[in-house]
Amino acid sequence: FHPKDLPGALVEIDSVTNTNYKEKYADWPPAGSDWRAQVNEDYVLGIVGVTIAAENPDKLSKLWSDVLDSKLTVENNYPCVVTENAKITFVQAEIGYVDLVGIKIKASNERVKLGRNIKMLGLDIEFISE
């Protein structure tokens, strides 16, 4: 999807034939044939959430919910799109601004002990326990 069609992040929806997309390490040809050998889960296990700031979070969350065919809920007064393995939270932004502003990463307890929150280049990163 082009960011103008689905604002907030670059979204790509693909599938690979002859594989179960629900498997954590399902085939993904663009990554090459030996990508699984490069996986290291000592600290990071996966992305489980993102936060998108939008001028109209209610409207944008409805669009994302429709496009992703996923449930739209409200948590802590913020609209959220709930997918099979992650949650997309929409928050209020300044006028004319739409962007990814946070990610939530499932991490090992060892990583979490190093610190739960960091900010990098304006992006809030939160590490949560396994």
Q: What would you call each of these model-derived segments?
A:
Residues 32-76:
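Surface-exposed interaction/gating patches
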Residues 1-49, 79-96, 102-130:
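Vicinal oxygen chelate
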